[in-house]
Regions:
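Glycine-rich active-site loop/strand segments that organize a redox cofactor
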Residues: 32-93
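N-terminal Rossmann-like FAD-binding beta1-loop-alpha1 element of flavoenzymes
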Residues: 2-29
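Structural signal for hydrophobic/aromatic residues that build the beta-strand cores
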Residues: 4-7, 30, 40, 66, ...
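N-terminal, helix-rich and Lys/Arg-enriched segments in bacterial and organellar proteins
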Residues: 12, 19, 40, 94-95
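Surface-exposed, flexible loop/turn segments at secondary-structure boundaries
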Residues: 12, 35, 48, 112, ...
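Feature captures the FAD/FMN-dependent oxidoreductase FAD-binding
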Residues: 77-141
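Structured beta-strand/turn binding interfaces of compact recognition modules in eukaryotic regulators
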Residues: 10, 30-33, 43, 107, ...
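Core residues of folded domains in eukaryotic genome-function proteins
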Residues: 2-3, 23-25, 32, 36-38, ...
Length: 141
């Protein structure tokens, strides 16, 4: 059975996860944050790479939206250049719409990934001080 590891549940990670699941493959995404959004989750914590509190995207929502879940599907009244918080909520709504949350392990640090001789990946993660190593056939970073 093919088993896929996706590192990160930001904008790219959730679309990768959705498309992998659409192919009926087993998949899990690991993310250091407590929710979907990646760098679009604003935080003053210096250990988290995030947008500035006043950030808005520089491309229009029309050019930045997902084809299978548009901003009009989410919130039609969002301005053409959404704020970081509107984007964060959009990404979280995308994950909810496509039932991605059960496939994401949050508050989880990916410590290292090793390609084995049998062409599998050993991925070691840490959550709440406990390490575990999982084996995957594919790795998406």
């Amino acid at each position: 059975m093919e088993r896929v590891c996706v590192i990160g549940a930001g904008p790219s990670g959730i679309t990768a996860l959705k498309n992998i699941l659409d192919q009926h493959l087993e998949a899990v995404a690991y993310d250091f944050n407590s929710d979907v959004g990646g760098n679009w989750i604003y935080s003053e914590n210096e250990s988290h790479s995030s947008v500035f509190e006043t950030t808005h995207i520089i491309s229009s929502k029309t050019l930045s939206q997902y084809e299978d879940f548009t901003f009009d599907d989410f919130e039609p009244d969002i301005p053409d250049y959404p704020s970081h918080d509107q984007l964060r909520r959009y990404f979280q709504a995308y994950a909810a719409k496509f039932n991605l949350y059960p496939h994401i392990e949050f508050n989880t640090l990916v410590k290292h990934c090793v390609r084995e001789n049998d062409k599998t990946w050993k991925v070691t993660v840490e959550k709440d001080g406990i390490e575990k190593t999982e084996t995957f056939t594919h790795l998406v970073v």
